[in-house]
């Protein structure tokens, strides 16, 4: 491992966005998203990366069984689409020296898009774990995470974040 990789690993957190049962089961085009998100979460945990769970404040006790917080992983209740505006997430990330974020969540066009843009705007390096994300509309999800779908779009997350898959989380953090 190079020194740069070690620094990336120790300054990286995983943000689990809106993985409440109701959201995962009703607002996802992809029935396999929970399994892949669980794999990505397990990889982050195994590597010792901090995991933050952000969900609407009314759903803080309604996590999908595969995606529930473990131990003392923080759960932040939000009142907006994104993870930053109505939580103390930024302060928590700064307190532990986080500079790089890996995001997964439902819905891609909601919490993932909003959180990615905010994180990018305030200086974080952002990686979107695209197969740990889903949207009610498969075409919208694809347009947001796959440059080849709509290459002229300024909406694509790939313009401001690196797209990865759940299998890559392990190598990114080791």
What residue spans do the PLM features occupy?
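…and closely analogous acidic/polar surface helices at protein-protein or active-site interfaces
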Residues: 27-44
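Short beta-strand segments at enzyme active-site cores
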Residues: 16-17, 49-56
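Active-site-adjacent betaalpha module
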Residues: 1-13, 39, 43-47, 58-174
């Amino acid at each position: 491992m190079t020194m740069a990789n070690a620094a990336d690993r120790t300054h990286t957190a995983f943000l689990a966005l809106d993985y409440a049962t109701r959201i995962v089961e009703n607002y996802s085009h992809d029935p396999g998203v929970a399994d892949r998100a669980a794999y990505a979460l397990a990889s982050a945990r195994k590597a010792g990366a901090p995991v933050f769970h952000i969900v609407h404040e009314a759903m803080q006790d309604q996590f999908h069984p595969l995606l529930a917080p473990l131990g003392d992983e923080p759960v932040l209740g939000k009142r907006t689409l994104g993870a930053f505006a109505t939580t103390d997430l930024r302060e928590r990330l700064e307190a532990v020296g986080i500079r790089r974020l890996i995001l997964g969540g439902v819905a891609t066009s909601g919490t993932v898009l909003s959180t990615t843009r905010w994180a990018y705007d305030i200086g974080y390096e952002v990686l979107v774990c695209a197969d740990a994300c889903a949207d009610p509309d498969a075409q919208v999800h694809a347009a947001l995470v796959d440059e080849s779908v709509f290459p002229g779009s300024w909406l694509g997350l790939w313009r401001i974040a690196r797209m990865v898959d759940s299998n890559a989380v392990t190598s990114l953090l080791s």
